[in-house]
């Protein structure tokens, strides 16, 4: 699985001399260029931000296709997820506010042709804080396929997060 996001912190772009304003266009083009490198026997790509021919990207990924997941809470991110990805990832959401993102994804699906090979768009969310069994059920009812729990950055954080997830799932 490969997670892709265009970024949202302008200072990070300044730090590496990249254009914040063009981040979406660059991301879209790089997705096309990467797929050419991964899947084409003789990869060639000519775009505004990536331009190559006579190269080969090896080793190639064993899993074909690579499951792409696009992150973001904007109309361009929703469009990118529908057009390119197997899944969409939302960060720090509640069961209540995930609905706005799902509405945005449906609107993008009405405007963008989704390749049939991608199948149904899988929805993954990192919830805001601990989740009760009732909240997990509400996420599922809203259309979320997967919850990704964020462990606190403490020595016991991962174990506590796993224990909480087990308790949540056991309560469903």
Where is each model-derived feature located?
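Active-site-adjacent structural elements that line small-molecule/cofactor binding pockets in enzymes
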Residues: 1-172
